[in-house]
Amino acid sequence: MPELPEVETSRRGIEPHLVGATILHAVVRNGRLRWPVSEEIYRLSDQPVLSVQRRAKYLLLELPEGWIIIHLGMSGSLRILPEELPPEKHDHVDLVMSNGKVLRYTDPRRFGAWLWTKELEGHNVLAHLGPEPLSDDFNGEYLHQKCEKKKTAIKPWLMDNKLVVGVGNIYASESLFAAGIHPDRLASSLSLAECELLARVIKAVLLRSIEQGGTTLKDFLQSDGKPGYFAQELQVYGRKGEPCRVCGTPIVATKHAQRATFYCRQCQK
């Protein structure tokens, strides 16, 4: 599933081609996504794009009359095409722009979303989200306060959008390794110093992944069709049985709630 770096990479890739241009019309070939594509999107016509923003894993296209909310789901990606090209099997939505470009949404598993809202504030998919991990609001003091009484393992707690948004399975595993914290540790057992370190490394890991265009494991592509290159720098995720790059101990993989967790027994306590 695309996580925060992949969504931010997509945002940065499409923004220069959309802002200042006008959506001439939308082409919806298959509106049966996670939720049905909003009727307003089918009717889009002559709508200038004012901004392209991100909140958590949602892309937000600001138009004069409202907002398009896009979620990439499990396998979605956005590409900028130089012109209208024949669609392939999983190309479900196009935005045809006044500058000749086309924003094309591809989603083999159709678990993404294209929604419309007049106002972002209070929209049900955005209403209960925690702070952005790259913002000043997310820091060690905040994390420690939220962990103090939490009797659950730290890894699933990091992946809870009410605590902090956008830290999915890949980056939770990588950040806990970088901080030397075992993923099964109770959140309440973390000291303030450990929370300060963890908050710092989460930011560093996410920023490094954004620099590398995100992580491509299967479906994700950048807006220019290239993969994300952070996969080459993964320390633990997807490396079961391979030697730890720090100590040489084989990487362990376990499963919790049907999500894979990767860690080093020696480096993470």
From Swiss-Prot:
Keyword set, alphabetical order: DNA damage, DNA repair, DNA-binding, Glycosidase, Hydrolase, Lyase, Metal-binding, Multifunctional enzyme, Zinc, Zinc-finger
Catalytic residues, chain numbering: 2-3, 57, 259
Catalytic activity: Hydrolysis of DNA containing ring-opened 7-methylguanine residues, releasing 2,6-diamino-4-hydroxy-5-(N-methyl)formamidopyrimidine; 2'-deoxyribonucleotide-(2'-deoxyribose 5'-phosphate)-2'-deoxyribonucleotide-DNA = a 3'-end 2'-deoxyribonucleotide-(2,3-dehydro-2,3-deoxyribose 5'-phosphate)-DNA + a 5'-end 5'-phospho-2'-deoxyribonucleoside-DNA + H(+)
Record note on cofactor: Binds 1 zinc ion per subunit.
E.C. code: 3.2.2.23, 4.2.99.18
An example Gene Ontology molecular-function term: damaged DNA binding
Residues given in the record as DNA binding sites: 90, 109, 150
SUPFAM superfamilies from the UniProt entry: Glucocorticoid receptor-like (DNA-binding domain) (SSF57716), N-terminal domain of MutM-like DNA repair proteins (SSF81624), S13-like H2TH domain (SSF46946)
Coiled-coil stretches: none
Zinc finger (FPG-type) stretch: 235-269
Metal-binding in keyword set: yes
Required cofactor(s): Zn(2+)
Source domain of life: Bacteria
GO biological process, one term: base-excision repair
UniProt cross-references to InterPro entries, sorted A to Z: DNA_glyclase/AP_lyase_DNA-bd (IPR015886), DNA_glyclase_Znf_dom_DNA_BS (IPR015887), Formamido-pyr_DNA_Glyclase (IPR020629), FPG_cat (IPR012319), MutM-like_N-ter (IPR035937), Ribosomal_uS13-like_H2TH (IPR010979), Znf_DNA_glyclase/AP_lyase (IPR000214), Znf_FPG/IleRS (IPR010663)
Pfam families: Fapy_DNA_glyco, H2TH, zf-FPG_IleRS
Family annotation (Gene3D superfamilies): 1.10.8.50, MutM-like, N-terminal
HAMAP family cross-referenced by the UniProt entry: Fapy_DNA_glycosyl
Its biological purpose: Involved in base excision repair of DNA damaged by oxidation or by mutagenic agents. Acts as a DNA glycosylase that recognizes and removes damaged bases. Has a preference for oxidized purines, such as 7,8-dihydro-8-oxoguanine (8-oxoG). Has AP (apurinic/apyrimidinic) lyase activity and introduces nicks in the DNA strand. Cleaves the DNA backbone by beta-delta elimination to generate a single-strand break at the site of the removed base with both 3'- and 5'-phosphates.
Family named by the database record: Belongs to the FPG family.
Known partners and oligomeric status: Monomer.
Protein name, as recorded: Formamidopyrimidine-DNA glycosylase
